[in-house]
Amino acid sequence: MKIITKTIRRAYNNWNPTKLIRCYHYAAAFDGSKMICFTQNNPIKTHTGAYRIGENYNISKYKEFPYYHSESRLISELLDMYNTISSDWSVVVMRINRLGKILGSKPCENCDKLLRSVGLEKIFYSNDCGDFIDGLNHRMIVDAVDISY
């Protein structure tokens, strides 16, 4: 699947391991196979945008701890850029630890609620084996490069 390959490539290009951060989460939105937005979490710095997402979507954890998750930052940036979100768009979420290994990145309960509340259902995420799961069907994507969605 081209969108997964594009996300992996972009994530490793942005990956900058430090001792302060044990892993990085990345999220990418696609319109067809075109990447329209790419984001990364920031577990160190609070952000008013994360707080605003918590307010707008009634997510108390984001209000209490206003740190962007990659998914919430993706939604915020998509709304800033397009003022709307299409249910036809796909989202790929992945995590890379400081050693460069792809790990599980299934969206947390709050991020899942947020993604679904804006109509995004085509969500793909990495597992601890470095494979990707189709979040809608809960099936592993066998060969991420050859499958088209």
Task: Annotate each predicted stretch with a short phrase.
Residues M1-Y149:
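Zinc-dependent deaminase catalytic domain
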